[in-house]
Swiss-Prot record:
It comes from the Eukaryota. The gene is Crygd. Has a two-domain beta-structure, folded into four very similar Greek key motifs. Keywords: Eye lens protein, Repeat. GO terms for biological process: eye development; lens development in camera-type eye; lens fiber cell differentiation. It holds the Pfam family Crystall. This is Gamma-crystallin D. One of its GO terms (molecular function) is structural constituent of eye lens. Detected in the superior olivary complex of the auditory hindbrain. It comes from Mus musculus (Mouse). SMART domains: XTALbg (SM00247). SUPFAM superfamilies: gamma-Crystallin-like. GO terms for cellular component: cytoplasm; nucleus. Belongs to the beta/gamma-crystallin family.
């Protein structure tokens, strides 16, 4: 079970809303989000309703302003609690439809360029666990939640290009 609290103002001030499940539309509860407190679980925040727009991965902790979660604005319109899995395994491919060179990961990777010798991934398969993919190295830049399943081309995980810099397992330690 997860718990997250959204605050309209920075520093955990102003009107707030507490949440423990996925929400496809948070607009009725607050007009802007400038700080967040994650009491438990791992969460993905979305700038738009229905789990669309820029994504932001948050784990337990305090985020006193939206820049702390690498947000571009104070817009949070939907959220998803990410289920925790015991093991993690993902396969990345250099071409669409699982073609070309493949590499499998079971651990976090801060620099795909260093491990894979290129930084464009056109398809992938999440075999176990949930992952967050970043378009820059060292877990920076645009973020994409990857749940178990097949992603035949980068559009399938919501990216506008094939650039991948790093990836991280979704893990929450209680």
């Amino acid at each position: 079970m997860g718990k997250i609290t959204f605050y309209e103002d920075r520093g955990f001030q102003g009107r707030h809303y507490e949440c423990s499940t996925d929400h496809s539309n948070l607009q009725p509860y607050f007009s802007r989000c400038n700080s967040v407190r994650v009491d438990s679980g791992c969460w993905m925040l979305y700038e738009q309703p229905n789990f669309t727009g820029c994504q932001y991965f948050l784990r337990r902790g305090d985020y006193p302003d939206y820049q702390q979660w690498m947000g571009f604005s104070d817009s949070v319109r939907s959220c998803r609690l990410i289920p925790h899995a015991g093991s993690h395994r993902i396969r990345l491919y250099e071409r669409e439809e699982y073609r070309g060179q493949m590499i499998e990961f079971t651990e976090d990777c801060p620099s795909l360029q260093d491990r894979f010798h290129f930084n464009e991934i056109y398809s992938l398969n999440v075999l176990e666990g949930c992952w967050v993919l970043y378009d820059m190295t060292n877990y920076r830049g645009r973020q994409y939640l990857l749940r178990p399943g097949e992603y035949r081309r980068y559009h399938d995980w919501g990216a506008m290009n094939a650039r991948v810099g790093s990836l991280r397992r979704v893990m929450d330690f209680y």
